Regions:
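PLP-dependent amino-acid enzyme catalytic core
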Residues: 1-311
Length: 311
């Protein structure tokens, strides 16, 4: 794609993303609407992949990545590739027959953007080694370049905090790989020494030990690590929990905002279970991902058809 088209697209990014005040379960929160950055390129993936949108890569002709066949990162990379005029190849170790035959959600949108899906077994890096025209992106965008866009997020929050004259701010966001939470805490501490801004998160994909390991892989100095909070019961990623569905519906009813169904319900359940966090003004980061709700919501509606009677 010619670069002037890219420049036009870039102008359309809604940055800094808006922050609004919401009330949920009789408690006031601030909400950072990263889901509104761009209709096709939003949330934490827009932050993680911002570096690849902003810089020149004259040798690159193709993006290669891997992960699940319904991932938000897969969809966002398909948009990035399309915006830059690159090919996009995505590896999965399995894909459900139902999804192949009935494409929907992130998978359908990525295919429509020109993604080529390939089945293979990890490690995937070996498949592209020695090819200098390929940009290889780790699963979920878990890499050092992600810090570039997340630093911008930190600066937006600092500017808003100063504008609102908030001395001590707590931030909450649910984590997959923990990349956003880690780089956010690190940059808030480095850029904003005179104010206390703490990042709290919860592991949605693995457990606390998994998340700590992810943090250490990206940053060895633990003073930059976010605070990890959890619920007492173990939570299995992607499993349908009635409590998750209920809180998601309540969020929509009380705030008018659609949240993601995979991460946000657990995020809000954990946050409400730790009221010590909102003893200070608390900012929740909406990280997008609502395109993936299509498949998840259908599963919830089939499993809990009379949920509204319980709200």
């Amino acid at each position: 794609m010619p670069s002037h088209h890219l420049a036009e697209k870039m102008k359309n990014l809604n940055l800094p993303s808006p922050i609004q005040s919401i009330t949920f379960q009789n408690q006031q929160f601030f909400l950072k609407r990263d889901d509104l950055i761009h209709p096709d390129f939003s949330g934490n993936k827009a932050r993680k992949f911002y570096y690849f949108l902003q810089n020149d890569f004259p040798n690159i002709t193709k993006i290669v990545s891997y992960g699940s066949a319904q991932s938000n990162a897969m969809y966002s990379l398909s948009v990035l590739a399309k915006m830059r005029g690159w090919g996009f190849e995505y590896f999965v170790d399995h894909i459900a027959e139902y999804l192949k035959e009935n494409p929907h959600g992130n998978y359908r949108a990525a295919i429509e953007n020109g993604m080529r899906l390939r089945q293979a077994q990890p490690p995937f890096l070996e498949l592209v080694e020695g090819k200098n025209d390929i940009l290889f992106i780790e699963e979920g965008g878990r890499q050092k370049e992600a810090e570039y866009g997340i630093k911008l997020l930190a600066q937006e929050i600092i500017d808003w905090q100063k504008d609102q004259d908030i001395k001590e701010l707590n931030i909450f966001l649910p984590s997959g790989t923990g990349t956003t939470a880690l780089f956010l805490q690190k940059n808030l501490l480095m850029l904003n020494a005179e104010r206390l801004t703490l990042v709290f998160t919860t592991p949605c994909v693995g457990d606390k030990a998994y998340l700590q390991k992810q943090f250490l892989e990206l940053e060895s100095d633990e003073k930059y690590h976010p605070t990890i909070l959890t619920l007492e019961n173990k939570h299995h990623f992607g499993k349908l929990y009635k409590e998750n569905y209920k809180i998601w519906l309540k969020l929509q009813q009380q705030t008018g905002v659609e949240f993601d169904l995979l991460y946000d319900p657990l995020g809000w359940r954990v946050l409400l279970a730790h009221p010590e966090v909102f003893s200070n003004p608390t900012l929740y980061i909406h990280q997008g991902g609502v395109l993936g709700n299509e498949s998840m919501l259908a599963r919830y509606e089939r499993k809990y058809p009379s949920i509204n009677l319980e709200l």
